[in-house]
């Protein structure tokens, strides 16, 4: 009877352990099973936030902790247990939970590079760090950053994202940016759309975007964007 009771308790324990929700993983730890479109869109959404830390804005800052170097003032990056965004899922199309990013803690330049390279190819990451070499800086091994950003594209009204599988190791993500400037340019206006096709490829280090654009990357020079006066 004792043996039966012990076996029953073990079975219940194992079942309880299997019933929990799986922990989210980073792109380079993503399962080798085929990605879904929603997985890829979630990867794009998280990668876009990371890309914008360099091109559009900056990481959260503690404005009470400042350092100066030359004419620049730096503030300590406050990015412990930072949650990266995912796209909104109205309704799951199957029983599998979509891929979601892990929370990240960024306290040094090395952490920042590691997080960026979780989503983007090393070449893209190198270019991002080169955009503004003085944007982020370690002081005594702790990450600081200058405050400010370039400001988002005023002409951007909205955008949509769609993913398509090319083969087992390659997806494309098509981002459609919509323009509308009537609210601040009337009676003139700029309307239309532009598209960017991004590549997500399975590399030796996991899934990485090998091409990318800013989250507000509307191309006002595109043939499908029109200006009326």
Could you say what each language-model-derived stretch is?
Residues 8, 73, 144, 151-154:
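Polar low-complexity intrinsically disordered regions enriched in Ser/Thr and small residues
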Residues 19-22:
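Bacterial signal peptide processing site
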Residues 25-31:
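Intrinsically disordered, low-complexity serine/threonine-rich repeat tracts
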Residues 31-147:
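Core segments of small alpha/beta cavity-forming domains
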Residues 149-229:
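Exposed beta-sheet edge and beta->alpha loop/turn motif
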């Amino acid at each position: 009877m004792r043996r039966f009771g012990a076996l029953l308790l073990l079975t219940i324990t194992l079942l309880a352990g299997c019933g929990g929700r799986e922990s989210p993983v980073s792109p380079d730890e993503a399962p080798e099973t085929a990605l879904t479109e929603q997985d890829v869109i979630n990867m794009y959404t998280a990668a876009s936030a990371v890309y914008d830390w360099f091109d559009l804005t900056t990481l959260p800052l503690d404005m009470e902790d400042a350092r100066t170097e030359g004419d620049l003032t730096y503030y300590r990056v406050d990015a412990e247990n930072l949650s990266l965004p995912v796209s909104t899922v109205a309704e799951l199309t199957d029983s599998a939970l979509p891929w979601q990013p892990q929370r990240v803690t960024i306290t040094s330049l090395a952490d920042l590079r590691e997080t960026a390279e979780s989503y983007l190819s090393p070449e893209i990451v190198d270019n991002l760090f080169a955009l503004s070499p003085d944007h982020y800086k370690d002081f005594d091994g702790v990450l600081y950053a200058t405050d400010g950003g370039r400001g988002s594209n005023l002409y951007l009204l909205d955008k949509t994202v769609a993913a398509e599988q090319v083969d087992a190791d390659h997806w494309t993500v098509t981002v459609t940016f919509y323009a509308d400037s009537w609210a601040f340019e009337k009676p003139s206006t700029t309307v239309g759309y532009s598209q960017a096709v991004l590549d997500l490829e399975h590399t030796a280090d996991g899934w990485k975007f090998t091409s990318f654009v800013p989250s507000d990357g509307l191309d006002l020079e595109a043939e499908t964007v029109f200006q009326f006066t």
